[in-house]
From Swiss-Prot:
Domain of life according to the entry: Eukaryota
Family: Belongs to the FAD-dependent oxidoreductase 2 family. FRD/SDH subfamily.
Name the record gives this protein: Succinate dehydrogenase [rhodoquinone] flavoprotein subunit 1, mitochondrial
Active site: R320 (proton acceptor)
Noted pH dependence of activity: Optimum pH is 7.5.
Top-level EC class as recorded in UniProt: oxidoreductase
Length: 645
């Protein structure tokens, strides 16, 4: 092992310069022989230890695969723990239900940008996934009869939208993600997975288009670790911290999507950013949609339950994009609350105190701490807040990462999987339904393990790394560590976040987006002016935050470019200058007699953004939406309609 380490250091020290992405600093290899490099070999390496990563790890460990989990924080601190409201599955505990109704709601919620084969896989496997969680020991809330308790969530209906609001969301009070994370972590330890905790993934290791592992920095002692593997799973979460006001934790910096970008993989549908209707005003902390599922409602300055005007049937339980836009319109038209009339009230105090204590204990505490509100007596001040990324690393329904070409269609990237929020299986399309996120995590984390078990055997040979693997990553690390510009990381990050908040918000307009694109491109060049004040390698948060900013910048620039280019309104992407959804047909009218628009003339297609790793230039392409289900005899595709709730 030591001989291999010394050999790598010698090879790295022999090189002089490297050409790197514009999102990185100008680097030189002259100083990097000082870094200790340690090699590891595993059947599978998983980057990230949230719900998706842990579910994949557990399945692989049970099957006897030597599995490593590389995570930049302790697993139970992963952002899955912040998920409050629940996980969707058509169990039928509270009322008759059918997974096909769940499938319909998911397709409708996506505003018909989701791939229906993947949505078929998600909803058909939902009941089994939740039952497995129960068997693993997840302590779901119960009905008096002992069944898993289910609440209403936005966009969920019975009988294909004809039977009223469904109760489909299984929960553990309002701490569902916390409970899931602890359950999965405990079970993955039982399966003998090896955890590399507080390791920061620097880059995927690629060999002629195949992923053969990952290179990471140990935050505790500054050593570099190269993990070679037969399969690599990216499960790093979203990039909410590209925005100023968001519900996501500070570690949600788009590391996985940035890893994919630097590996030459185009990202899918990044323009679709979900704004949750109820983030605490001025703070951003999440107030679960479950609070409205339990009977809470939104009011404006006139005390009006205004959602009745925007969604006469679903009211406060319309899909999140609809509710967030309604709130924003109320504020823009002068009906906001507070001294500045710039937010909305969420009212819960009409509900029995016992119900709040039993079903919503966490948000009662959160509202008290962060808003100074007693929910049994006062409304909670809320505002739409960045919450979720619908886009990410494109995959098929098996969670295999794909590249799309017009000539060959979808092609699998050998050796690479993705799951969780960093992935775009395209089950959410243009707008995710509440409580489909935890479901996405466990279903596609599970899919990773199922498909890897079909592809591999534990005793197969692990491929060798190519010559000089990871050199560029170490050189960039060294350049960031010794960066001596005049712009502090925190200052540049704040400017980026405010730019994204202002120019790519709930409502968008061409001139504002174009201005935002220019600003973001200029800001990305400012990365070369970063100043790192701490030169150490041991628990150096200044260094880590600079690396995270590089990742955030890649995500933010691709997001705003994709948003500026999509000239329609669909789901979470709402354009004032292009207020209509542009499909291949006008679905507000009978399609008989209509001529189908060619692919380049409509917008019911996935955006693909590919950022050049050397120039920073972003190339746009488009991928067709998959309308065909996995088995039309089991459930046929849901044709587009004009959404209403």
């Amino acid at each position: 092992m030591l001989r291999a380490v010394r050999a790598l250091i010698c090879r790295i020290g022999a090189r002089r310069t490297l050409s790197v992405s514009s999102s990185r600093l100008d680097v030189s290899t002259s100083n990097i022989a000082q870094y200790k490099v340690i090699d590891h070999a595993y059947d599978v390496v998983i980057i990230g230890a949230g719900g998706a990563g842990l579910r994949a790890a557990m399945g692989l460990g049970e099957a006897g695969f030597k599995t490593a989990v590389v995570t930049k924080m302790f697993p139970t601190r992963s952002h899955t723990t912040a998920a409050q409201g629940g996980i969707n599955a058509a169990l039928g505990s509270m009322n008759p239900d059918d997974w096909k109704w769940h499938f319909y709601d998911t397709a409708k919620g996506s505003d018909w940008l989701g791939d229906q084969n993947a949505m078929h896989y998600l909803t058909r496997n939902a009941v089994e996934a939740v039952t497995e969680l129960e068997n693993f020991g997840m302590p779901f809330s119960r009905t008096p009869e002992g069944k898993i308790y289910q609440r209403s969530f936005g966009g969920q209906s019975n009988n294909y939208g004809k039977g009223g609001v469904a109760k489909r969301t299984c929960c553990v009070a309002d701490r569902t993600g916390h409970s899931m994370l602890h359950t999965l972590y405990g079970n993955s330890l039982r399966c003998h997975c090896t955890f590399f905790i507080e390791y920061f993934a620097l880059d995927l290791l690629m060999d002629k288009g195949r992923c053969v592992g990952v290179i990471a920095l140990c935050l505790e002692d500054g050593t570099i670790h190269r993990f070679r593997s037969k399969r690599t799973i990216v499960a790093t979460g979203g990039y909410g911290r590209a925005y100023f006001s968001c519900t996501t934790a500070h570690m949600n910096t788009g590391d996985g999507t940035a890893l994919a970008t630097r590996a030459g993989i185009a990202l899918e549908d990044l323009e679709f950013i979900q704004f949750h209707p109820t983030g605490i005003y001025g703070v951003g902390c999440l107030i679960t949609e479950g609070s409205r599922g339990e009977g809470g409602f939104l009011v404006n300055s006139e005390g009006e339950r205004f959602m009745e005007r925007y969604a006469p049937k679903a009211k406060d339980l319309a899909s999140r994009d609809v509710v967030s836009r309604a709130e924003t319109i109320e504020i823009m038209e002068g009906r906001g609350v507070g001294p500045e009339k710039d937010h909305i009230y969420l009212q819960l105090h009409h509900l029995p105190a016992e119900q709040l204590h039993q079903r919503l204990p966490g948000i009662s505490e959160t509202a008290k701490i962060f808003a100074g509100v007693d929910v049994t007596k006062e409304p909670i001040p809320v505002i739409p807040t960045v919450h979720y990324n619908m886009g990410g690393i494109p995959t098929n329904y098996k969670a295999q990462v794909i590249k799309y070409t017009k000539e060959g269609g979808d092609k699998i990237v050998p050796g690479l999987y993705a799951c969780g929020e960093c992935a775009c299986h395209s089950v959410h399309g243009a707008n995710r339904l509440g409580a489909n996120s935890l479901l996405d995590a466990v279903v596609f984390g599970r899919a990773c393990s199922i498909n890897i078990k079909e592809e591999l055997k534990p005793d197969e040979k692990i491929p060798e790394l190519p010559e000089g693997a990871g050199e560029e990553s170490i050189a960039n690390l060294d350049a960031v560590r010794y960066a001596n510009g005049d712009v502090p990381t925190a200052e540049l990050r704040l400017t980026m976040q405010k730019t994204m908040q202002k120019h790519a918000g709930v409502f968008r307009r061409g001139d504002i987006l174009a201005e935002g694109v220019k600003k973001m491109m200029d800001l990305s060049k400012e990365l070369k002016r970063l100043k790192t004040t701490d030169r150490s390698l041991i628990w150096n948060s200044d260094l880590t935050e600079s690396l995270e900013l590089q990742n955030l910048m890649l995500n933010a620039t691709q997001t705003i470019v994709a948003a500026e280019n999509r000239k329609e309104s669909r789901g979470a992407h709402a354009r004032d200058d292009f207020p209509k959804r542009e499909d291949e047909y006008d679905y507000s009218k009978p399609i008989e007699g209509q001529t189908k628009r060619p692919f380049e003339k409509h917008w019911r297609k996935h955006t693909l953004t590919k950022q050049d790793p050397r120039t920073g230039h972003i190339t746009l392409d488009y991928r067709p939406v998959i309308d065909k289900t996995l088995d039309p005899a089991e459930v046929d595709w849901i044709p587009p309609i004009i959404r209403s709730y």
